[in-house]
Every structure is written in structure tokens, then in C-alpha cells.
Amino acid sequence: MSSKEIVSNRKALRNYEVLDTLEAGVVLTGTEIKSLRDHGGNLGDAYVAISKGEAWLLNASIAPYRFGNIYNHEERRKRKLLLHRYEIRKLEGRVAQKGITIIPLGMFLSRGYVKIRLGCCRGKKAHDKRQTIIAREKQREVESAMKRYR
């Protein structure tokens, strides 16, 4: 079971603290699949909303397929996520908590199907972002020191 990341949301990892992750299928059209295989997607402003017991991916941009003619898809349409009922209830419970939102972290191919990795996230404040940068720099210094004394 190989999986190949085709779109990632690097902005989410910088602006949000990921508390929990989940995989879901996505209902897509043929031209959307072909465009994603050419890495024509963007999850920068995307989020997941739950309404009437269904999960929807909103504001995800999939570029029009360059060889698609009049049958090409809309770039920013609502896309249904394929989840079990208990997974949707779990997400609804997490979103009900204050400050928690569901953000797509990446899209990947799994056995020919496009899957999306969702994260239950809490927004980072400016000081949290600085702490993350400081911790990353300290880790880099430690690794370089270890490399030097091998």
C-alpha cells in the first residue's frame, strides 16, 4: 500500500497546532483527478465544514486541467468527504470545542484514489510561532554539534 503526497498544506503546519489527524476520501471528477496528478492543487485557505451529517471540503483550489475542454471543473467548488458516520460525529465533537477547526494537511494517492489527511487544529498565537522557531534552531544546533564530534 504505497501512498504518494501530491498536495501539502505547509501553511497549516506553521499557523496551527495539530491535535489529531484523520484520513478521508474525496469525491472528485475526472478532470480534478488528472489536474491533481499534475500537482495542480492548493490547500492554503481550505477548511472542512460539517453540515447535515456530511463533511465538506471548502475553499480548496484544484487548477483546471489544461487538456480539459468544456467539461472542465470549477476551481473552488464544494467537495464531499467520504467518512464513516462515527468519524463525522467525532469531528463534530472536536469542532464544538472552542478554538478547534478542521484543516486539510495534505492530499495523497493511495491505490489510485485521492485521499486527504485532515487535522483537528488549534490556531497558534505569535508567541507560539516564535517558540517553535526557537526550538527548531536549538535542535539544528544540537544536530550540528553532534555531527561535528562524531
Swiss-Prot record:
InterPro entries in alphabetical order: SmpB, SsrA-bd_prot, SsrA-bd_prot_CS
Key words, A-Z: Cytoplasm, RNA-binding
Pfam family, one: SmpB
GO biological process: one example: trans-translation
GO cellular component, one term: cytosol
Entry keyword DNA repair: no
An MF annotation (GO) of this entry: RNA binding
Subcellular location: Cytoplasm
Tagged with keyword NADP: no
HAMAP family recorded: SmpB
NCBIfam families referenced in this protein's UniProt entry, alphabetically: PRK05422.1, smpB
Family, similarity comment: Belongs to the SmpB family.
Function, as annotated: Required for rescue of stalled ribosomes mediated by trans-translation. Binds to transfer-messenger RNA (tmRNA), required for stable association of tmRNA with ribosomes. tmRNA and SmpB together mimic tRNA shape, replacing the anticodon stem-loop with SmpB. tmRNA is encoded by the ssrA gene; the 2 termini fold to resemble tRNA(Ala) and it encodes a 'tag peptide', a short internal open reading frame. During trans-translation Ala-aminoacylated tmRNA acts like a tRNA, entering the A-site of stalled ribosomes, displacing the stalled mRNA.
Protein name, per record: SsrA-binding protein
Originating organism: Chlamydia caviae (strain ATCC VR-813 / DSM 19441 / 03DC25 / GPIC)
Gene that encodes it: smpB
